């Protein structure tokens, strides 16, 4: 028996919409990362992009557990000595809620060209409940493991 390797003509791409309202950030990000990478499909091939498109709505209403809302920070560095920037989670969520989910999903993807390509092409995040991808007729997805308890 030979090992199956997907070819571009075999891949059937679908669109999904996920409502992030009341969901835990990390659990939601791990499920979304699986879908945009294609690991939920039996034809998953590590060296190819077999994933589906995911639209995340209500990004501004995502939740974190524990005291992460006050304690979590995002780190960046300008390249100059002493120019570290630590941005609190609450301020990023208030100004750019899309970036919170994008950064969480990026952290769960491989740091390769394929991982960056999958994130850039397959993930669409919106702060509110509206999105412009109605024409793709996305199917609604729910994750019971990501819901806040």
From Swiss-Prot:
Gene3D superfamilies the record matches: Ribosomal protein L13
Top-level taxon in the UniProt lineage: Bacteria
GO cellular component terms given for this protein: cytosolic large ribosomal subunit
Gene Ontology BP term (one): translation
Single GO term (MF): structural constituent of ribosome
Keywords carried by this UniProt record: Ribonucleoprotein, Ribosomal protein
Keyword field contains rRNA-binding: no
Keyword Metal-binding: no
Sequence similarity: Belongs to the universal ribosomal protein uL13 family.
Summary of subunit composition and partner proteins: Part of the 50S ribosomal subunit.
Its job: This protein is one of the early assembly proteins of the 50S ribosomal subunit, although it is not seen to bind rRNA by itself. It is important during the early stages of 50S assembly.
Protein name per its UniProtKB record: Large ribosomal subunit protein uL13
Organism this protein belongs to: Gemmatimonas aurantiaca (strain DSM 14586 / JCM 11422 / NBRC 100505 / T-27)
Name of encoding gene: rplM
